[in-house]
Amino acid sequence: MSWQAYVDDHLMCEIEGNHLSAAAIIGQDGSVWAQSANFPQFKSEEITGIMSDFHEPGTLAPTGLYIGGTKYMVIQGEPGAVIRGKKGPGGVTVKKTNQALIIGIYDEPMTPGQCNMIVERLGDYLIDQGY
């Protein structure tokens, strides 16, 4: 299965009638493995910041989590494994695998729990597969 198929079929899938707004699988080096058509153009320093928070949990909390220039307030995640961000009625979930970052961006009516489930389920599967 191609990386694009993982984004299209597993991240942008329907859950209880809702979809993520955008999603991507990004290498930990910042390279794009696959992304939805509307995933924001991100800066390499945004990925560097995310990786720093995975290595030293809490580093993003004071400044916020940025993806494509959009600032998300960091909310409770799983140190070293998942970073969650909130912005108004939407937010973002970032799951770290051995080699990549699975990123899901959502807006209402999708709930944070639905976004977390989609992103973390694929992340856990890829970890089990060695990625």
Curated annotation (Swiss-Prot):
Keywords from the UniProt entry: Actin-binding, Allergen, Cytoplasm, Cytoskeleton, Disulfide bond, Phosphoprotein
A cellular-component GO term for this protein: cell cortex
Chain span(s) of sequence motif Involved in PIP2 interaction: 81-97
GO molecular function terms listed in the Swiss-Prot or TrEMBL record: actin monomer binding
Residues bearing PTM Phosphothreonine: 111
Post-translational modification: Phosphorylated by MAP kinases.
Subcellular location: Cytoplasm, Cytoskeleton
Keyword Transport: no
Disulfide-bonded cysteines: 13-115
SUBUNIT field: Multimer. Occurs in many kinds of cells as a complex with monomeric actin in a 1:1 ratio.
Family label: Belongs to the profilin family.
Function: Binds to actin and affects the structure of the cytoskeleton. At high concentrations, profilin prevents the polymerization of actin, whereas it enhances it at low concentrations. By binding to PIP2, it inhibits the formation of IP3 and DG.
Name of the protein in its database record: Profilin-2
